[in-house]
A protein has these predicted regions:
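N-terminal binding-site loop/beta-alpha segment at the start of enzyme catalytic domains
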Residues: 1-86
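Beta/alpha (TIM)-barrel catalytic core signal, keyed to glycine-rich beta->alpha loops juxtaposed to Asp/Glu
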Residues: 3, 7-10, 135-290
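Short, well-ordered coil/turn segments that N-cap beta-strands
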Residues: 19-23, 56-58, 83-86, 124-128, ...
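Active-site mouth loops of central-metabolism enzymes
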Residues: 30-43, 98-109, 138-141
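Short, acidic/polar
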Residues: 38-52, 106-121, 170-174
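Short beta-strand segments at enzyme active-site cores
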Residues: 59-64, 89, 126-132, 165-166
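A short, structured active-site edge motif that brings together acidic residues
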Residues: 85-98
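Active-site groove signature of glycoside hydrolases
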Residues: 119-139
Length: 290
């Protein structure tokens, strides 16, 4: 499966030399149940990471609050010293409670500690890209991001961060963010049924900024899932493959980070770049959006 990930094309983050294959990998599912603790099978998790990179994935999404600490430590164990050209994108702005809850962590000290935790657990001196995560679980909440983003900009000037992105944000928050630091990517919930960001995707594409959707199969009703299943079967694809293929065809600035803890599912996801969606099927899928 050499360079399978490259078949989806590539995108260069604005103002950088980082050219990423559009099919990346999200490490969230490598942790244990509820994204807590170690995986049931560490060797399998290591195999998934190594196979992803062998297949041409050069963009891994992670965070030190996955586990916590678990996915970053697995990435280091599997891939360090890192191959040339591999870009590791991490997130800060949240933490895990002792009850496994997801809590905001946006104070100055929490952000500084999070960056240093990521550096230590990934075995890096500088983080390639750090996304500032704000808002709710899946929905952005409009409000000022000046204070936390200013902290990341300071850490960038200190050489601890190369580039900055935003996660779970609104267009107005992006505008505010761009007045503080150069923003190379936006990571929001978006898929064939969650279409609130349609205009945002197009605006970012016009500016040359990457859009990285998470939850490619999230938010489907049973009826919508059934329609997706039928459309996928008609194309001899899995529903996930069709959902990913739709995103790839939606806009050239979209970068994918599907996650899995299975080598078999990793291979299936990478095959999504081969799925060609006829115009009629695209119309059927577009009718699902809300």
């Amino acid at each position: 499966m050499p360079q399978q990930a490259a078949l989806a094309g590539h995108f260069t983050l604005p103002g950088t030399s980082m050219t990423l294959n559009r099919m990346g990998y999200g490490a969230m599912q490598l942790a244990g149940p509820q994204v807590w603790g170690p995986p049931r099978d560490v060797a399998a998790a290591i195999s998934v990471l190594r196979e992803a990179v062998d297949a041409g994935v050069n963009h891994i999404d992670t965070s030190d609050y996955y586990g916590p600490h678990v996915t970053n430590q697995l990435i280091k164990q599997a891939l360090h010293p890192y191959p040339e050209g591999l870009v590791i994108v991490t997130k800060v702005g949240a933490r895990r409670g002792a009850d496994k809850s997801w809590l905001p962590a946006l104070s100055r000290q929490e952000l500084i500690d999070a960056v240093h935790d990521n550096l230590r657990n990934l075995g890096l001196d500088t983080l390639d890209v750090v996304n500032l995560r704000v808002g709710g679980f899946m929905e952005p909440s409009d409000g000022s991001i000046e204070a936390p983003l200013t902290v990341l900009a300071e850490l960038q000037r200190q050489g601890l961060i190369r580039h900055i992105g935003l996660s779970n944000v609104t267009p107005s928050q992006l505008a505010q963010g761009q007045s503080i630091a150069a923003i190379v990517c936006v990571q929001n919930a978006y898929n064939v049924v969650l279409r609130k960001d349609d205009g945002f995707v197009d605006d970012l594409a016009a500016r040359g900024i990457a859009y990285v959707p998470f939850f490619p199969m999230g938010g489907f009703t049973p009826v919508q899932s059934s329609i997706l299943d039928d459309a996928a079967a008609s194309l001899h694809a899995t529903p996930m493959q069709l959902a990913l293929a739709w995103l790839l065809q939606r806009s050239p600035n979209i970068l994918l980070i599907p996650g899995t803890s299975s080598v078999a599912h990793l291979r299936e996801n990478l095959e999504a770049s081969k799925v060609e969606i006829p115009r009629k099927v695209i119309g059927d899928l577009d009718s699902l959006g809300r």
